[in-house]
Amino acid sequence: MSTGRWFRPRTIWLPTWRVWLPLLLGTILAGGWVVTNVHAWLSVTAPVEDAKYVVIEGWVPDNVVREALDWSNKHGVKRIFTTGVPMDKGEYLSAYPTYAEMCASTLKRMGADSSKIQPAPAAAVKVERTRAMAMGLKQALDMEQIPAADRKINLFTSGTHAFRSRMHFRRALGPEWQVGVVSVPSPGYPPADWWHYSEGVKGVIDEGVGIAVQCLSP
C-alpha cells in the first residue's frame, strides 16, 4: 500500500545539546529567581509617608489590624477606613453584618479613637471582592470631601495580597489619589521559606492568577 498520497517525508532540524543545555540552565536559573523573589514582589510595602488616611481590608487577621493602628498612632492619621463585603460565615452568630464593621469594632477594642474609625462596607459579590471593597472605599471618601492636597492613603493588608490590592484600589480611586500599601507578613509561615508551606504556595498561586485576570479585565 502506497503512503505517498497521505504522507510525505520531511527533514526536521532539531537543536543539539549545545542549544538544549543553555536553555535548560536558563530555565533553572529563571525558576530559582522566581522562587526567591516572587513572594517579596507580591508582598510589596511602599507607603506614602505623609498620608493622613489609612484603609484596612476587613478580612485580614488581627496582627494586620494592630500594625495599622500602631502606624496610625505614630503618624497622626486623621481617619481609619475599614472595608469588607458581607459576612459569608457566622452571620447568624455575629453582631456585625460585614467584615468592614467587624474590623472597625476590633480597632475599638484595641484602643483606637472611635471618632477616627469609619467603616466602608462593600456590596455583596461572588467574585472580585477586592474590587468591590475598593469601590466601597471610594464612595466613603467621596462623602468626606477631602481637599486635593490631602488625598493620600495607605492600604494595610496581609502578605502576598498587597500587590493586587494596590492595583484595585489605585484603579478605583483614580489618579487624584496617592495610594500606598503596607504588607504585614502572615503569622502562618516565614516569607523567606514560603514554598515550604501550603499557605505560602497557595497565596503565591492565587495572587498570580488574580493579577493575570485583573490585567486582562477591561
Where are these regions (language model features)?
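A structural signal for short, hydrophobic/glycine-enriched beta-strand patches
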Residues: 39-196
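A transmembrane-helix-recognition feature enriched in membrane-embedded lipid enzymes
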Residues: 195-218
